[in-house]
Amino acid sequence: MNDADTNLGSSFSDDTHSVFEFPELDLSDEWMDDDLVSAVSGMNQSYGYQTSDVAGALFSGSSSCFSHPESPSTKTYVAATATASADNQNKKEKKKIKGRVAFKTRSEVEVLDDGFKWRKYGKKMVKNSPHPRNYYKCSVDGCPVKKRVERDRDDPSFVITTYEGSHNHSSMN
């Protein structure tokens, strides 16, 4: 690492802008709360912004804090980071709007009949639990509801079902 790279890093960390804010952890459509996901999305996606527009908006009038001219790769990184940060803010706002309800039920079967049809889209092992978590989406086109089902860590005779969102249609029964 040369002195220019070191100065660039310290200039960013001393600035009041949070340029080094990283995107939230995310796995495609899955919603995770309590476990660490190893995939980071957002940095490889195109957000529809021109790199020069975003970099110019971020640094207009403040370029004097740099001791060297910005390279194109620096502008690209800053623009990608800024747009990823803005995208994550939108995800946080959407998450607040959705309702989340959890039920703990004693059951031999994992998927209980709740009056809706579900499509399984994922399964993963959860930290500190010997039982996998299963992910489902409502099978009606355009319905945003998701649910996850897992056995209780402490008492496997219980199933924890968590619903996120509200159905935009009536039940199937």
Curated annotation (Swiss-Prot):
Pfam families: WRKY. Residues 107-172 bind DNA. It comes from the Eukaryota. It comes from Arabidopsis thaliana. One of its GO terms (biological process) is defense response to fungus. One of its GO terms (molecular function) is DNA-binding transcription factor activity. Keywords: DNA-binding, Nucleus, Transcription, Transcription regulation. Belongs to the WRKY group II-c family. Transcription factor. Interacts specifically with the W box (5'-(T)TGAC[CT]-3'), a frequently occurring elicitor-responsive cis-acting element. One of its GO terms (cellular component) is nucleus. Its main location: nucleus. PROSITE patterns: WRKY (PS50811). It is found in: Nucleus. This is Probable WRKY transcription factor 50. The keyword DNA-binding applies. InterPro entries: WRKY_dom (IPR003657), WRKY_dom_sf (IPR036576), WRKY_plant (IPR044810). SMART domains: WRKY. The keyword DNA-binding applies.
